[in-house]
């Protein structure tokens, strides 16, 4: 899985769950034609407790690292959590707003 495939999967999931979001960082810069090397994707998103089940279902533990406990803490404290695709080394940082 490459960064664009992972980004597509993330945004399709966020759209399906009704989570508003903003792609930022190097991936956003590349979309505007600024070449960058990156192994992570940064997204600011309005994730709420009601979205946790959908996120866990969309990114199964046999393919991704995603911690329910860390998501809950990130929502409670307005922090960030990661969705990691170990076989590709790609990481998505979700910054909770």
Question: Where are these predicted regions, by residue range?
Answer:
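Compositionally biased terminal segments of proteins
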Residues: 1-97
């Amino acid at each position: 899985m490459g960064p664009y495939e992972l980004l597509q999967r993330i945004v399709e999931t966020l759209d399906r769950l009704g989570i508003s979001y903003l792609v930022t960082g190097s991936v956003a810069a590349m979309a505007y034609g600024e070449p960058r090397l990156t192994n992570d994707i940064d997204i600011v998103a309005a994730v709420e407790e009601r979205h946790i089940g959908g996120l866990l279902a969309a990114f199964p533990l046999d393919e991704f690292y995603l911690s329910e406990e860390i998501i809950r803490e990130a929502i409670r404290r307005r922090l960030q959590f990661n969705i990691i695709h170990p076989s590709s080394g790609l990481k998505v940082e979700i910054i909770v707003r």
